[in-house]
Amino acid sequence: MLDKLEGIEKRYQELEDLMSDPEVINDPEKLKQYSKEHASLEEIVNKYRQYLETKQEFEEAKEMLEENDEDPDMEEFLKDEIPRLENQMQEIYDSLKILLLPKDPNDEKNVIVEIRAGAGGDEAALFAADLYRMYTRYAEIMNWKTEIMDSHEKDMGGFKEIVFMIEGKNAYSRLKFESGVHRVQRVPSTESSGRIHTSTATVAVLPEAEDVEIEIDTNELRIDTFCATGPGGQSVNTTQSAVRITHEPTGVVVSCQDEKSQHKNRDKAMKVLRARIYDMYLEEQQQQEAEERKSQVGSGDRSERIRTYNFPQGRITDHRINFTTHRLEQVLEGEIDELIDALITTEQAEQLKKMGA
């Protein structure tokens, strides 16, 4: 592993030299390419250099202890210092193993999140709205930007479906494990007998797809326009501003009506369409690695029940990793890092196990 790290540091140094080369400075494309690669190696190189510095301090301390035969205070200090440095080296080494794990190429991307009310009628729609609020609050905490792409509200409040975009650094890496069925157990406000109801909502987190990743032939699209509707299906405007796009080869249908302009709705719908088709392609790839996926944190299967939100007990349980927290209120206010970090840590541990690290 240390040989690999040495090679990475060498490449990092090469890139620094290339980026200061006048020929590269005058070529924006090359400069962008090298800068991106340089940035991707920075964290691991800094950690490796920290490891080398600590190792040197450790070896020097050991040498000083061997040579010291006159100063009892120094001897006592070194006997404390050597195990401390050894533990620090091990911690840095373990961090390096995680940094060397294969990266998901989509981790840095923006995401499109789709939340759909499942079983449970009006209560499921209200829960879908709670999840939407939870993710948008989390986006605020992370300084990410959110934008609604399409939404269908219910008469009683809540959403039958809401599709929104989250733009920000590493959005996909933090949110990708949210895909699946979320279940809520609570007493609805309309329930006079105090009986607990169970409802569900399905979440899909799709990485935003670039034009270069997914080429869509416009001849394979059917585009329909219609009047936007509000809760209960009533028309909310008289112009044909809402857009429905059907990708005929895959049967994927996307509609968007949140903007007043047909052009803007079409742009948003195309973003969602591209992400859905890209997601289908990724799912096919994952199915080819089915055996590998069995041991990973959830299969990403949208029908898999991943989490239960139990209101009477103020408890949230993530079923994939048997993780429970009693911070229900805080989680619904967007404080979901505890859940996300637990999922990422489990995934990393499984990857390390597979690699025999």
Swiss-Prot record:
SMART domains: PCRF. It is found in: Cytoplasm. Pfam families: PCRF (PF03462), RF-1 (PF00472). SUPFAM superfamilies: Release factor. The keyword Protein biosynthesis applies. One of its GO terms (cellular component) is cytoplasm. The modification N5-methylglutamine is found at Q234. Keywords: Cytoplasm, Methylation, Protein biosynthesis. Residues 286-311 are annotated as: Disordered. Residues 290-307 have a biased composition (Basic and acidic residues). InterPro entries: PCRF (IPR005139), Pep_chain_release_fac_I (IPR000352), Pep_chain_release_fac_I_sf (IPR045853), Prokaryotic/Mito_RF (IPR050057), RF-1 (IPR004373). It comes from the Bacteria. GO terms for molecular function: translation release factor activity, codon specific. Methylated by PrmC. Methylation increases the termination efficiency of RF1. Belongs to the prokaryotic/mitochondrial release factor family. Peptide chain release factor 1 directs the termination of translation in response to the peptide chain termination codons UAG and UAA. NCBIfam families: prfA (TIGR00019), PRK00591.1 (NF001859). This is Peptide chain release factor 1. The gene is prfA.
